[in-house]
Regions:
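N-terminal auxiliary segments of SAM/dcSAM-dependent transferases
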Residues: 1-13
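Terminal helices and disordered tails flanking the catalytic cores of nucleotide-processing hydrolases
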Residues: 3, 21, 31-34, 42
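Short, aliphatic-rich beta-strand segments
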Residues: 20-26
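Conserved SAM/SAH cofactor-binding pocket of Class I
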Residues: 33-113, 119-122, 128-129
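Mobile active-site "lid"/loop adjacent to the S-adenosyl-L-methionine
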Residues: 83-85, 124-149
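Short amphipathic alpha-helical segments
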Residues: 90-91, 131-135, 177-179
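Conserved Class I SAM-dependent methyltransferase catalytic core
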Residues: 146-181
Length: 181
């Protein structure tokens, strides 16, 4: 695992919907399938709303934030509960224009971002938690409070004409881990 992680960080990973490779830190979720990213990219191409601000909840390697900037959003506020995600994306952005367009916060769900926004994006964990999780497992397994907490907080932060995009896998249903999903 450590060698593979080092190679991904050092050499980068090509993501079809991005112009540049990403260089994820160890323990950071990064996509290995791209259907949902292509779907989101197509949605962003057709999006007609304001592009002043957006919030990316649980940004991981930053792909969704980068997509939103690539499609004209002026500012993205992004949160993650993994400190390596903050370090990794901060290092990737460096002192480029991106670092002024994407603001990061180490925090649960919306972290310190209380402002209302035009767009909220969330690619949540996709399997119900069967045990206590930590580290990268938090990107895969969710607890029973995640979605009620997310929707309650999102309601307060979404502008009246705003949009909420939830990119959610049906893996739990396909693998019969959960019938409710």
């Amino acid at each position: 695992g450590m060698n593979s992680s080092w190679q991904w960080y050092k050499n980068g990973i090509s993501i079809p919907v991005l112009r540049n490779k990403i260089h994820p830190y160890y323990g950071i979720y990064f996509p290995t399938r791209f259907d949902h990213l292509v779907l989101f990219d197509n949605w962003l191409k057709r999006y007609q709303g304001s592009k002043k601000t957006a919030i990316d909840v649980g940004f991981g390697s930053g792909v969704l934030s980068l997509q939103m900037i690539q499609h004209g959003f002026q500012k993205v506020y992004a949160t993650d509960i993994n400190p390596n995600a903050i370090v990794g994306l901060s290092e990737f952005m460096g002192t480029t224009k991106l670092s002024r367009k994407i603001e990061l916060d180490f925090g649960h769900l919306f972290g310190k971002w209380n402002k209302q926004t035009e767009l909220i994006v969330f690619n949540p964990p996709w399997l119900p938690e069967a045990h206590d999780t930590e580290g990268i497992d938090n990107a895969v397994y969710y607890n029973k409070d995640l979605f009620p907490d997310f929707f309650a907080a999102a309601k307060k932060r979404l502008l009246p004409e705003g949009k909420l995009v939830l990119l959610f896998s049906n893996l739990a249903q396909i693998t019969n881990v959960s019938k409710e999903h």
